[in-house]
Amino acid sequence: ILATDLSLSYGMRGQYHHSWDEIGHNGSKSLAIWESDDLVNWTEQRLAKIGDEQFGCLWAPDVIYDKKAEDYVVHWSSSHARNNYGEKAIFYSRTKDFKEFSKPEILYEWKEHDIIDSALYEEDGSYYLFVKCGQNPARILLLRSDEITGPYTRIEAFDKSMETIEEGKYEAATAVKLEDGRWCLFLDYYGVPGDRKSTRL
């Protein structure tokens, strides 16, 4: 399991001074990792410092296996000193054992907007990358590449599909391939409270 080490509920008022800019600059300098051989018993959490001091945060990590290189591509969103910790981009690093990681490189960026929440999948030799773009309004993008590390090209047909659903604040795209070969896309809709009340099921 890879996770972001944010501790927001404890640090928002104190460590981060109620500031998302402060979180983006100093929140989660490492990725948290747990390991298991059986999905029941897990190791204690350890922190992997993949980025250097130029990284302001390492958020929303995900991983995909690269069959060609026979290693794993870990990708995440970060702010960085190269643009004064402004718009975030998607970075990646390679590893074979989740202990040693290659130097991070850019996987995808859009210099005018935040790009976060990457989810990467392989289908029929092509690679598909979902990201959240911080445009106004914010939106989910789908991109395609022949290589796992890009370059990636935006799929405009997906934009038109997204226009058919209710406008709102969506993020954290996750896709699952169904038994019939179709893909099912899940989105976190954070525009309204997540609970619903009912007198019956």
PLM regions: where:
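Carbohydrate-active catalytic/glycan-binding domains of CAZyme proteins
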Residues: I1-L201
